[in-house]
A protein has these predicted regions:
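Histidine-acidic metal/acid-base catalytic patches
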Residues: 2-18, 25-111
Length: 111
């Protein structure tokens, strides 16, 4: 079968229709975000940057779980990424959790 968003992107104007990709859920669904960026270049300007625990698959701090953020961010240009939103659903310690996620991303992006 075909993914619904492949159909949508194949049949809409690339300058008018863009997508927002949740990196954690795409990864969990065994969808490679970088492959999606290459298949639909410039169509993913918005990202949900979140992670899932390697064992429980529950939401985790960014950089501690299953998502390969280095490879994904290395391909940001191909995606057309303009903005990303850092999330952790049900964060047990929201301020500490988002601070840890921020610190991870800051180190990754400014290495």
């Amino acid at each position: 079968g075909h993914r619904p968003f492949d159909y949508i992107l194949a049949n809409t104007d690339k300058d008018m229709v863009k997508m927002e990709l949740d990196l954690a859920w795409a990864t969990k669904a065994k969808q490679d975000p970088v492959a999606l960026f290459k298949l639909h270049p410039g169509r993913f300007p918005l990202w949900h940057v979140k992670d899932l625990d390697k064992t429980t698959m529950s939401p985790a701090e960014v950089g501690t779980g299953i998502v390969d953020f280095k490879t994904i961010f290395d391909n940001a240009k191909a995606s057309g990424m303009k903005y990303y939103f850092v999330e952790q659903d049900g964060a047990p310690k929201p301020i500490q959790n988002v601070t840890n996620s921020y610190n991870y991303l800051n180190k990754l992006l400014h290495a």
